């Protein structure tokens, strides 16, 4: 039996191209990595990043208006200062719900950082989490991120209610939700730049 399996494996391996062999090895390494708890989150984030795509905008008839009550929803920054969405309503708002333990959140973070580097305070970046500031600060420093992080101060408005993270909303200065995306995405894309540039005209 052992010699038979060895022979079958040899024939299988000889028929494979070098590309197929490398693909098989990468797949095996990924499976092994997922079985190791310490590396599972990083590998899951890597895979999520590979499959992420630039999100599209909602059709105009599906772009919900943010209510005045929701504009009063408050969040606190790293220093404890409290803000409401209405403080940012004169510019595009990039509202992202995330967590440090979430692989798809981690996967899209570098792209959000690049988008933030490109636009800075011309766009209101609100990365909202319910984790402790200490844990978030340690994560941000380890990864080298400096996007603005905010913390829940009250329940999330119905317009932004979600069962999954990451979920991202892009809100126009006219208070319309033009993008609602659940899952990792490529945010620093040409399409996204065009959308934000149009909003700021």
Protein language model annotation of sequence segments:
Residues 21-37:
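Hydrophobic membrane-insertion alpha-helices, especially the h-region
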Residues 65-67, 72-93:
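A short beta-strand-turn-helix
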Residues 89, 97-114:
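Conserved redox-active cysteine motifs that mediate thiol-disulfide chemistry
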